[in-house]
Amino acid sequence: MMGDADNDIDTEPRGRLVIVGTGITGVSQLTLEAVGWIEAADVVCYVLADPLTERWIHEHARSTEDLARLHQSGVPRVHAYRAMSERLVEHARSGRLVVGVFYGHPGVFTSPSHWAVEAARAEGISARMLPAVSAEDCLFAGLGIDPGDGACQSFEATDMLIRARVPATDAHLVIWQVGVVAQMGLQTGDGHLGALVQYLLRFYPATHLVTHYQAAQSVVADPTIHPVPLGELGTLTLAVTSTLYVPPLAARDYDMAIAASIDLGGATAEPSDASAVAVDWYRPMPEGPSRLGALITSLSTDPSLLDAVRADPRPYLLAVGLDVIEAWAFLVRDQRWINACIREGSGPAAAVALGAAATQEEARSFFVHTDGRLVRRAKRPLPSPDTVSTSPA
């Protein structure tokens, strides 16, 4: 709306959309940040896989809406997903803080969350997605797999088939949604699992041991870990939450010429069993509280406080008693200085640890210049952020 100079602003309601995930076991894998948003929301819209998490949300949210009601039997899931995303944006359009809660990681095999964030941003509505624990994260932990040990590839079962994706047999392979191959609706069952098995047999022998994996759905349950020869995989009864892990047939050799060209010619050997050698820069975390650490912890779990501090941080920095260096680090968002202040417990101690001052007494003379720089009263200039040591003190 347009009016006089004092009212020449957009008065249309502007809501906000935040998407969070519950992880796989629900309540136990909710992050503190996600809990803070759920409790702060005007309305929480959810699609969940267990009644415990649903009950927890009803107990902690001001208002709730179950988006699973938009599913219709016999109708392609994509139609329900579109309706879910539109419902989330509809709430935000009305000026509300709406939190969408999805099972697992909200951005992994969850189309409505991505569509809602994209649509909201296109309309000028603030929208963001927070990370959460996914089924693959649980698989790595449950099977003891490090995706950084060699390489790891991740395919969706139906997509792998219809696009004829070729796996690298010298890398870990994770195949999602093996229990619902080629199923577009809400029906469950093994579907076309046999077709997936036959496709994989083009690349792996029938005797190759694979693992059918299902993450535990609650803290009182155990995961399903069922090793089986690939040729016998079709005899298993799978579920919507089933994931398949296929280990590499063999490790890939190093390209020694490339390794040598990037100065890694001698770094390709397997690690030895030698005892760890103490490093001279390490020292334990100092005892005692951190004012800056306590403030940032509070901001991590209280969205309302975070909004207020972002709008005008100075009153809050004064209220919690930050020293000049702590306040400066927070205001300029210099993560190296923030980390040092939290670790050392104060700004002057952080300045000494980072090599910006010889003593804490010297650091206490620092002040913030009118141009926003942290300066000392002595003649010796402070090192620039690019030259301050980042090694632990």
For each of these PLM feature ranges, what is it?
Residues 2-28, 32-130, 242-243, 265-285, ...:
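Class I S-adenosyl-L-methionine
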Residues 2-20, 37, 43, 93, ...:
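Beta-strand/loop-alpha-helix module characteristic of Rossmann-like adenine-cofactor folds
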Residues 52-56, 138-139, 308:
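Phosphate- and divalent-cation-binding pockets in alpha/beta enzyme and binding domains
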Residues 96, 125, 205, 304, ...:
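Short phosphate-binding/catalytic loops that engage adenosine nucleotides
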Residues 103-104, 178, 215, 313:
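Short, well-ordered beta-to-alpha junction loops that form the rim of enzyme active sites
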Residues 114, 133-134, 303:
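Alpha-helix N-cap/helix-start capping motif
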Residues 259-393:
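Terminal, compositionally biased segments used for targeting/anchoring and flexible tails
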